[in-house]
Amino acid sequence: MISNLSKVLNSNVKRMYTTAKNLESVVIVSAVRTPIGSIGGSLSTIPGTKLSSITIEEAVKRAGIKPSDVDEAIIGNVISANLGQAPARQCALGAGLEQKTITTTINKVCSSGMKAIVFGAQSIALGHSKTVVAGGFESMSQVPYYADKMRFGAKYGNQTFIDGLVRDGLADAYNGSAMGVCGDDCADKYKITREQQDKFAVDSYLRALEAQKNGFFNDEIVQVPIVGRGGKVTYVVEDEEPKKVLFDKIPNLKPAFTPNGTVTPANASKLNDGASSVILMSESHAKELGLKPLARIIGYADAEQAPIEFPTAPALAIPKALKNAGINMSQVDLFEINEAFAVVGLANAKILDIDHNKLNVNGGAVALGHPIGSSGCRIVVTLTHLLQNKNLKYGVAAICNGGGGSTALVLEKL
C-alpha cells in the first residue's frame, strides 16, 4: 500500500514539474471597458453585474470567438453586498456565456480586476483552460447601507446605519481610518507637497480631457445603453468625471481626511461605477483559431507591506513582475499605475525613478474615476490599447490595494 502511494505521489510530482516546464504563453485577444460613471450619475441605475455582462459580451465579440469557446470567467468585485449569489456567475450568464462556463468572483480590494487576470493567465499557462474572460466591476452607486443590529432586533435606543462603501471598500480594516489617511501618511513620509499633488491632479485631468477630445479611448470603450422614460434609449459613450473638473477651485480645497493633510477631493480618485473585461487565451490556441492577439502577458507579481503603507506597494510589486518577465525598468515604454490618490503616482514614480512622460499618459483615476473592483483590469485594458496605438513594445500596469498590497502585470505588444 505504501509502495502504491509512493508511486502515485511520484507520478503527481513528475506531472507537476512537467507542467511547470511547459507553461503555455498567455495572450490578450481583446480588451474592453465601459465608460466610467460618477457616483449617482449616468450609470448609477445599472447593476454592476450588468455592466460587467456588457463588457464580457463585447470582449467576446471583438475577439472573434463564440460564447461557447469561453471555458472560465474570473471576475473581480469588492463590495458584493446585495448583488445576489455568485456575482461572477451573474456576469457570465448575463453576457450569454454557456452554463458550462466555470465562474469565480475575486476580492483583492482595488487589485481585484488585475488579480482576476493573473488567475486567468495561470489557469491557461497550466493548461487548465484554453480561453478565459477576466475582469472586474463595481457599482459604487448601488452599494447599500448596513443595518447590523437588525438580525436579532434592536433592544433599546437609536440605531445607526453603516455605509457599505466605507466599511468594506474604503476604510482600513485594522484601525478604521479612511484610505486617504494612508495617503496623507505617504505624502509626509516621502515629502510630497500639496502643490505637487495638485499639479499631478491637474495634469491627470488635462491628459484625460485631451484623450477624450482626440478619441484615444474609443478603441477600449463599449457604449452602455440607458433605457429612460417611455422606453427611450440613450447611450453613455465617455467617462463622466473629466469634464466636471473646476480647475480654479483645486488650490483652495480643504484637506479631505486629516486636518493638516494634503489629500483633497481633487487630488484623490472619485467614487464611480464601471466594468472592464479581457479575453485571455493560450498563444497556441489563438494561432489555431487564426486570431491576432493584442499583447502577451510576460510577467506578474504581488507584494504586501504594512496596511498603512499600501500606497507604495506597487514599488515592491513592479520590480518583482519585471524580474519574472525578464526585462528591466529601462525597457518599459509605458506605465499605468492606478491613481487612488495623486500621491500614489508621485510616490511610486519617486521610488522607482519613473519618467512622468511614461506614466498614465491618458490620465488616471484622479481624473477618470476609480470603480474599485474594475480598476485593476481597466488599467490593463488602457495599457493594452496604448501599446497598440503608439506602437510601443513593453508596458507595466500596477495597482495598490487596501491592507498593504499590490498587483503588477507586464505586457508585450504583439
UniProtKB/Swiss-Prot annotation:
Catalytic residues in the record: 110, 370, 400
CDD domains associated with the record: thiolase (cd00751)
Stored Gene3D superfamilies: 3.40.47.10
Binding of CoA, residues: 205, 244-246, 249, 269
Cross-referenced InterPro entries: Thiolase, Thiolase-like, Thiolase_acyl_enz_int_AS, Thiolase_C, Thiolase_CS, Thiolase_N
Reactions it catalyzes: 2 acetyl-CoA = acetoacetyl-CoA + CoA
GO cellular component, one term: peroxisome
Sites where the protein binds K(+): 205, 266, 268, 366
An example molecular function term from Gene Ontology annotations: metal ion binding
Pfam families: Thiolase_C (PF02803), Thiolase_N (PF00108)
GO biological process, one term: sterol metabolic process
Keyword check for Kinase: no
Record's keyword terms, sorted: Acyltransferase, Metal-binding, Potassium, Transferase
Enzyme Commission number(s): 2.3.1.9
UniProt similarity note: Belongs to the thiolase-like superfamily. Thiolase family.
Stated name of the protein: Probable acetyl-CoA acetyltransferase
Gene source species: Dictyostelium discoideum (Social amoeba)
